A protein has these predicted regions:
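Short polar catalytic/cofactor-binding loops
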Residues: 7-13
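Acetyl-CoA-dependent GNAT
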Residues: 18, 22-30, 34-111, 115-116, ...
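Short alpha-helical
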Residues: 11, 157-158
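Structural preference for beta-strand elements that scaffold enzyme active sites
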Residues: 111, 147-149, 190
Length: 196
């Protein structure tokens, strides 16, 4: 496997978007407030019946090909993992970009965001995601970032477990983050990797 780092471009995003990001939702993390939060917060996993497929690229206005329309990507980097010249995984990191709500952490410029990560279903659980994550963290550290921030949802339990294995810790839980009807039931989970 070979991982290359490139600036974001329309041509590359078209190729990148062909790597599926969809996953089957088999369980979700339930947020339980103990004593309305004063006694703590607990997460527990609950099976989802029936299971369903979630595809971030199918959400209106989302998907890699739209990023150039929405953001100045000059401080972004795109990582592509290839096997025999075929893209099988990718990751995108955003840095110093006005309009990216996740980078508005008090106006700090020492935080980078793992904006997108995807591995082709036939190549998952082979270490590609870990290799991509490592490259993203290295890139952020080279830019003197203190933290790498990652957003997931409570319905993407495999991603939550993946980020914990990479050394991330849960920093934020927002039960009211999403208002669009198709995702209003989801909880935003923000993970942080300490790069210091």
């Amino acid at each position: 496997m070979q991982i290359t780092t490139m600036p974001v471009s329309a041509e590359l995003l078209t190729t990148y978007s062909m790597i599926p990001i969809s996953f089957e939702v088999k369980s979700k993390l339930i947020v339980e407030l103990v004593d309305d939060g004063l006694g703590g917060i607990a997460l527990h996993e609950e099976e989802v019946i029936p299971t369903y497929v979630k595809d971030y690229d199918e959400i209106k206005g989302e998907g890699p090909v739209r990023w150039l329309e929405r953001f100045n990507t000059s401080d972004w980097a795109l990582f592509v993992a290839r096997e025999e010249r075929i893209p099988v995984g990718g990751a995108t990191v955003a840095f110093r970009t006005p309009g990216v709500h996740m980078l508005s952490l008090g106006g700090r410029e020492d935080v980078a965001v793992l904006w997108d990560m995807r591995v082709h279903p036939g190549h998952r659980n082979l270490g590609i995601g870990s290799a991509l994550f490592s490259e993203v963290a290295k890139w952020a550290k080279e830019r003197n970032c203190k933290y790498l921030q990652v957003e997931t949802q409570n319905v993407n339990v495999p991603a939550c477990r993946f980020y914990v294995r990479q050394g991330c810790q849960l920093g934020e839980i927002n039960r009211l983050a999403y208002s669009a009807p198709e995702v209003a039931h989801e909880v935003m989970l923000i993970w942080y990797l300490d790069l210091q």
